[in-house]
Amino acid sequence: LDPDIYFYSSIGQIFKMLDECNILLTPHITQILDKGLSDSPENIWHSCGMYNLGFCGLKRSASALQMLKWWHARLRNDCYIDSYNFLYTDQKWMDFLPSFFSPQELKISFNLGMNIAPWNFYEREIFEEDNQLYVRSRCNKDRKDRVIFVHYSGYDYKELKKGGTVQKNILNIKKYSDIEKILFMYGKAIIENVEIFDYFISLQYSYGFYSNGNVVTSVHRRLYRSMISKGMKDDNPFLINGMFYSLLAKKKIIVTTKSNLDKLTKQNFPNAEKKLRSFNLFMKMLFSILGYERYFLLIRLLHPYSRLESQIHLLDDKYLDNNIH
């Protein structure tokens, strides 16, 4: 379970499902609706996978152990987000499971009360009946389930504690009056457990800093991964007297505070339109110099070159002709 999940009724229903299967998954979305009705574009599921790994149910069995062994072998080196290599942390690997296991071994739950989350708020409506929370399809009112758990993914939890609502992952999410009620309920639960909440929300990620306190950025991680794949050996990359940190320091790719680069998106990039215009004018000039064929060959090359992993030539000249994977 992810730590941002809140249960509203007994998990006994989940154990009953596991009596009849060995592996239990919940899809991000479960209903066919007209294009454009969802709060996030449908093609996002091609990137992050059809099943949400905020929840996964397993029963000790041969097939579950087989799956865990298979999964473990892949997560050792391929548990991160990289659209170029079609990876999305531990989650996207689950798309393989329906091809591996029979319906008796693997159950895909269509219970609307499981894994209610921002990505499916548009298809699920919360309502109260006999002092219990239920959920039904917004387009098919006859279908309903008891609310088991809600996954409050992507919210600013400090804002929820103050009574506000900020969804950081789906920027243009619609306001649903029924969802506002369960957001308020979660905020109230945070306040009721404020000491525990404040303690854990203030903790910093143990592997987010080098031994001298400088910040490990996403750029550093991806450069390190690339250099390891090229054969570099560094037993502890967090030590400032290690090979990797020494290369970063020498090339001035070290930051002392959290990098703004990690936070930048297309939506919050400052003066994006003005900078895009300037860049496009430069590319037009380059097109006039290179001509049609060489320009578009360059554009094709820039796809793999633009990956952070391909910038290892900045650290060591020996990668000047061997930096693209």
Regions found by a protein language model. Name each.
Residues 1-325:
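Glycosyltransferase catalytic domains, chiefly GT-A lineage
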